[in-house]
Amino acid sequence: KELGFAKVSEEKLAVAKKIRDFVIGGGFMFAMCSATDSFDIALSAEGVDIAEAMFDGDASEPNYQSKINYNKTFAFTDFDLVRSPITYEFSSIDMTSKRNIPKTADYFSLIEFSAKWDPVPTMLTQNHTTLVKGFMGQTTSFDRETVKTNVLVLGENKTNREARYIHGTKGKGMFTFYGGHDPEDYTHRVGDPKTELDLHPTSPGYRLILNNVLFPAAKKKKQKT
């Protein structure tokens, strides 16, 4: 209320819209885990009360699913929101509860691109291997059926029909979404000790994060005429 919002949900929507405007204006957004789908859900539900009473003090709107506007999202479409407040899930975007993959077989593959024709995805997928260990998160990976057709899949588990690492454009800017929480802590939970990065100097999963950290510094060379 000190910031001028009646409810926390309104404040969170305002933050999501600020990020949206930053990207549309030419900025770059990198998000992981639940920062990916929750961001798109917030944008899609602008003007619609989807929060139950225990979260914001009043009931959600009746039939709110039918009022979701997928045209407002960055990456996802045709997803269903999870209504139950006791279910640890936001929507049908996330594959965590749908996947049946043991840790020993949990990997995703990076798509190979041409540096000449696709410089941006080539930079974002640079790695010493094309096979990357999977890892869990509140949002582990994305159901391919909910990924918009104009969004580029950079990494996927094709057998399981899940996208793990995606990239797209919005306005003058770009975004990258990466499912999962910590590439070197398979089931990192709240309260767990932090991962010692020095122990994983050649982590393929961390390399993808680094690619996105360094990406905004990459400048296009002027073409000779």
Task: Tell where the protein language model's regions lie, with residue ranges.
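Carbohydrate-binding surfaces of carbohydrate-active enzymes
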Residues: 20, 36, 46, 57-61, ...
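Extracellular ligand-binding/catalytic regions of CAZymes and related secreted enzymes
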Residues: 49, 146-225
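Short alpha-beta junction capping motif
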Residues: 1-38, 212
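Conserved aromatic-histidine-acidic binding/catalytic patches
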Residues: 7, 20, 27-31, 123, ...
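Hydrophobic/aromatic-lined pockets within catalytic cores
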Residues: 23-28, 40-51, 213, 217-218
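Generic recognition of flexible, low-complexity loop/linker segments
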Residues: 17-19, 55, 141, 163-166
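Mature N-terminal, pre-catalytic/accessory segment of carbohydrate-active enzymes
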Residues: 19, 95, 223-225
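An acidic, glycine-rich "communication" segment
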Residues: 32-152
